A protein has these predicted regions:
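Acidic-basic catalytic patches of nuclease active cores, encompassing PD-(D/E)XK
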Residues: 2-89
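Core catalytic machinery and nucleic-acid-binding channels of phosphodiester-processing enzymes
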Residues: 90-91, 99
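Conserved catalytic cores of phosphodiester-cleaving nucleases, focusing on short active-site segments
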Residues: 100-113
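Catalytic cores of nucleic-acid endonucleases
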Residues: 111-162
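Domain-level recognition of nuclease-like catalytic cores that cleave nucleotide substrates
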Residues: 143-196
């Protein structure tokens, strides 16, 4: 039996499920290749449906179109517990209710599935502006956790918040966010090595 921290033992099934979720969050699927007799769009739809079915299974639901929200929030909570950070639901303040509060931080979770198309993830770019008052309202810094494709897109997509290729303009914006006690973080950086 493994333990999440010194006080909370968890069973091996829960550990295996958590590792499976972490692997999903940190592993970009391979690019779809042309196959004879099957269009790329058909393959993409199959992958999208398979991911949705898997995600719904992970959250104990079926056909929930917003499964990534519940999966990402639950996954971050589990990892925060594993790290001994005492996550809990915060009380609503100033019309806001971030996803998690710990003893030292507030957390807002932004998750995007791997087969999402278009500009669905772009709203995360302005999350720090929307939640600018959270550090003052809760008297704790805010960490915006980017999970799965959301993390990938912010490291390898058009607008980079992570990695070596962040533009000078974006660095200035992220520095301004830090002066407000707001920081974007990669989910993969939260995960203990034995769960990757």
């Amino acid at each position: 039996m493994e333990t999440t921290n010194m006080n909370n033992p968890i069973d091996s099934d829960k550990v295996d499920k958590l590792k499976e979720k972490c692997k999903w969050a940190c592993t970009k699927p391979e690019k779809i290749q042309k196959k004879e007799g099957k269009k790329i769009s058909e393959q993409r739809k199959e992958q999208e449906n398979a991911e949705k079915e898997w995600g719904n299974n992970m959250i104990g639901q079926s056909n929930n179109g917003q499964w990534t929200t519940l999966l990402g929030e639950g996954l971050v909570r589990d990892i925060l517990e594993l790290r001994g950070e005492n996550p809990r639901k915060p009380e609503r303040k100033g019309g806001f209710e971030p996803d998690w509060e710990t003893d030292d931080y507030m957390y807002e979770v932004k998750t995007s599935n791997w087969w999402v198309a278009g500009t669905a993830g772009e709203k995360v770019l302005g999350t720090w502006i929307k939640y600018q008052d959270i550090p003052t309202l809760y008297n704790k810094p805010l960490k915006i956790v980017c999970v799965a494709n959301q993390e990938y897109e912010l490291e390898y997509g058009k607008v980079k918040y992570f990695g070596d290729n962040v533009s000078e303009k974006t660095k200035k914006i992220l520095e301004l966010a830090r002066t407000w006690e707001i920081e974007y973080i990669k989910f993969s950086d939260l995960i203990p090595n034995n769960y990757k």
